[in-house]
């Protein structure tokens, strides 16, 4: 299958269900054999920090699975710093993306054939 998707997660702190669904959609696409990547940007960097640190939540296990599978492509370096989650993000070992003035590049993914989804 030639379809590829990149999900940019911008869900705010009070939109945990939206961020969790990004993980679920990524898992579904991956399990169906469709290439998928997750990029946490904007307020979504706080969601990533929460997935990593809230070990009692079901989303933590899904986060770990997506990380292990290499589905999580990265997190915005600028936003991680500005939103005060730079240290928790650094501890995840997930690449910090900074191609466009400290932010991840959506064009890079489009040029690689990915269809973007923004949540």
For each predicted feature, which ranges?
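Short, glycine-rich nucleotide/cofactor-binding loops
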Residues: 6-20, 47-53
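Histidine-anchored nucleotide/phosphate-binding helix
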Residues: 18-33
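Short internal beta-strands
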Residues: 26, 36-42, 73-79
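Small/aliphatic-rich secondary-structure junction motif
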Residues: 30-50
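Mid-chain, well-packed structural core segment of small domains
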Residues: 55-96
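C-terminal structural segments of small proteins and small subunits
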Residues: 86-112, 117
């Amino acid at each position: 299958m030639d379809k590829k998707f990149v999900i940019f997660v911008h869900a705010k702190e009070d939109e945990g269900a939206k961020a969790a669904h990004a993980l679920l959609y990524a898992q579904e696409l991956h399990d169906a054999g469709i290439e998928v990547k997750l990029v946490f940007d904007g307020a979504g960097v706080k969601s990533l920090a929460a997935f990593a640190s809230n070990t009692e939540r079901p989303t933590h296990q899904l986060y770990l699975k997506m990380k292990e599978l290499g589905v999580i492509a990265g997190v915005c370096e600028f936003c991680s710093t500005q939103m005060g989650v730079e240290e928790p993000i650094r501890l995840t070992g997930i690449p910090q993306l900074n191609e466009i003035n400290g932010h991840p590049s959506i064009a890079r993914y489009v040029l690689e054939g990915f269809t973007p989804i923004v949540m």
